[in-house]
Amino acid sequence: MSAQVATVGKITQVLGPVIDVEFPPGGLPEVYTALKVTNTSISAEADNLTIEVAQHLGENMVRCISMDSTEGLARGQAVKNTGAPIQVPVGQGTLGRILNVIGEPVDERGPITSSQTWPIHRPAPTFVDQDVRVQAFETGIKVIDLLGPYTRGGKIGLFGGAGVGKTVLLMELIVNVAKERGGFSVFAGVGERTREGNDLYHEMQEGNVSTPRTWMESQCVLVYGQMNEPPGARARVALSALTIAEYFRDMEGHDVLLFVDNIFRFTQAGSEVSALLGRIPSAVGYQPTLSTEMGALQERITSTTKGSVTSVQAIYVPADDLTDPAPATTFAHLDATTVLNRAISELGIYPAVDPLDSTSRILDPNVVGPEHYAVARKVQGILQKYKELQDIIAILGMDELSETDKLTVARARKIQKFLSQPFHVAEVFTGAPGRYVELKDTIQGFKELAEGKHDDLPEAAFYMVGNINEAIEKARKLAAA
């Protein structure tokens, strides 16, 4: 965005979160420019409300979208042109903090120490800067690494209802990236419940992911635009979080994890803004620019020659309709899907990832290697056979099965148990120390199980352990007890 002359305009109309501002001739701000106005109903500070230029109406008039409450504004009030887009603080000073859409701290722990700011509207990396190598991103979580591996610099969709463990899985990924890889995580709360955002922060403190005492050593940034915020804030908070992540990738060369909860709310906020600006709606009432807005966000999430931004996005599916334009547009950008299943969580298996529904673009022998691919497909085959046999077992019982099927069921139940794993962030609840399992150990363990090398061990030995050696040791203790 080119440098602009700082000018002062005046409010001519306020329609909810939409504000029309008139500027003197020759002083019209560009689209996406941030303007400042004083709203005494928010606080006593001057220029405390940020609004963003969305449209040029002609006659030196611009239409803007507010990032906070517009109650208390009046016609004729002065509006300052900042001459630049919304800028958010970036760098080490943001770690361990909670920010809002315009980069202000909302955790009551003083100002942000970072001296550098970046604009939230930025171009995607050019083809020359992108890293075209396809690489798996090791998470240390067995079920993900084996059956639905994540791509470095890729985009992952996380599907799951309330209470099946989405938040715990997100927190474990944050911990594993911080501990094992020294990487940073940025969490964008887009249109989520304030209570959930608050709970996440306090659970992170209990799980030692982000603590006030050690926030300088913390490796996580939280950026929130909750449900009660105006649509402008909810439509921009994902961009603010992404900008912070891009700084760590481009300037410090880190592998960054970006969590977005919930990407549907980003689309929903864009739809509200579009309607407020008077655009004619598209299919199902969504904005006509849906694909463009989603593409502008998603194309910035990628690997470059300096580092990577890998994104895990929780996706709400309206009325369970996968053909709805909002989730359908998101699916086009995803490299992997991790599906959390309530039926699995009811069995007490955590993480409750569905091994048959979760998919990955890189579960391919040319990317993950022939051994990994063969083991993953064999494990899925055994689990699929078990699923098909469950109706027979429910009606007739195990005794009616053939010897081969009995063996398949026994192995499948062990595999199902072995897909569980103790998490670092759940230590405070379970008392069991968390486990990070390396990919080679995961492949070896499941290979031995699928081949029947541990048919003599009890099922209980495979529940909530790390690698296969721990399961063997647990079986020895169970036998001795």
UniProtKB/Swiss-Prot annotation:
Q: How does it sit in the membrane?
A: Peripheral membrane protein
**Catalyses which reaction?**
ATP + H2O + 4 H(+)(in) = ADP + phosphate + 5 H(+)(out)
The keyword Cytoplasm belongs to this UniProt entry's keyword annotation: no
Locations listed in the record: Cell inner membrane
Q: Which E.C. number(s) belong to this protein?
A: 7.1.2.2
Which InterPro entries is this protein grouped with? AAA+_ATPase (IPR003593), ATP-synt_VA_C (IPR055190), ATP_synth_F1_bsu (IPR005722), ATPase_a/bsu_AS (IPR020003), ATPase_alpha/beta_chains (IPR050053), ATPase_F1/V1/A1_a/bsu_N (IPR004100), ATPase_F1/V1/A1_a/bsu_N_sf (IPR036121), ATPase_F1/V1/A1_a/bsu_nucl-bd (IPR000194)
**Does the UniProt entry include the keyword DNA damage?**
no
Q: Which PANTHER family does this UniProt record tie to the protein? A: ATP SYNTHASE, ATP SYNTHASE SUBUNIT BETA, MITOCHONDRIAL
The family this protein is said to belong to = Belongs to the ATPase alpha/beta chains family.
On assembly, the entry states: F-type ATPases have 2 components, CF(1) - the catalytic core - and CF(0) - the membrane proton channel. CF(1) has five subunits: alpha(3), beta(3), gamma(1), delta(1), epsilon(1). CF(0) has three main subunits: a(1), b(2) and c(9-12). The alpha and beta chains form an alternating ring which encloses part of the gamma chain. CF(1) is attached to CF(0) by a central stalk formed by the gamma and epsilon chains, while a peripheral stalk is formed by the delta and b chains.
Write out the function statement from the record: Produces ATP from ADP in the presence of a proton gradient across the membrane. The catalytic sites are hosted primarily by the beta subunits.
Read off the HAMAP family from this record. Answer: ATP_synth_beta_bact (MF_01347)
Q: What is this protein identified as? A: ATP synthase subunit beta
Its source organism is Stigmatella aurantiaca
Q: What is the lineage of its organism?
A: Bacteria, Pseudomonadati, Myxococcota, Myxococcia, Myxococcales
